[in-house]
């Protein structure tokens, strides 16, 4: 895997992943955002093929059978997956492939790419702030929000498996940190090449 780079973003619902992802794509033109496939209902303001590829459960299960996905998982009773072929094509074009996945997806992608993939865990300063953000989104009922907070607590136990941590308490600072991490990936590539030359 000599071309491109892989950056994985994970974090609890409501931490600001979508905002930071959009900002990164706007700041670095060579970023390819891997659009996940999902069986969950489309939310207001979302577009098929832009935010997600929305499919039926039957379609998703058939894709699993056909080994379409690099990784897939069932989250909050819905299925999410990452198609492998477009990722491979983007890497061949020397792009930075950006993933926005849950902790389980992070582990699967890391297992596939190894040290070639770098990862960022994004979270809020504390659980109360996360709860406020989830409520302000007005996309979930209170029961779902409490369930998401439990999931967030579980996800926080995996922080040590990530290369970077961003506490998103100031959106401007968080955006700058994301861009700096993404730009550093090319330097890490040079470091890998240097090691190869030394061995040669």
Swiss-Prot record:
The keyword Transferase applies. It catalyses: GMP + ATP = GDP + ADP. One of its GO terms (molecular function) is ATP binding. It comes from the Bacteria. ATP binds at residues 11-18. Its EC number is 2.7.4.8. The keyword Ribonucleoprotein does not apply. Signal peptide: none annotated. GO terms for cellular component: cytosol. Keywords: ATP-binding, Cytoplasm, Kinase, Nucleotide-binding, Transferase. Residues 4-183 form the Guanylate kinase-like domain. Disulfide bonds: none annotated. It is found in: Cytoplasm. PANTHER family: GUANYLATE KINASE (PTHR23117:SF13), GUANYLATE KINASE-RELATED (PTHR23117). Essential for recycling GMP and indirectly, cGMP. Belongs to the guanylate kinase family. This is Guanylate kinase. It comes from Helicobacter hepaticus (strain ATCC 51449 / 3B1).
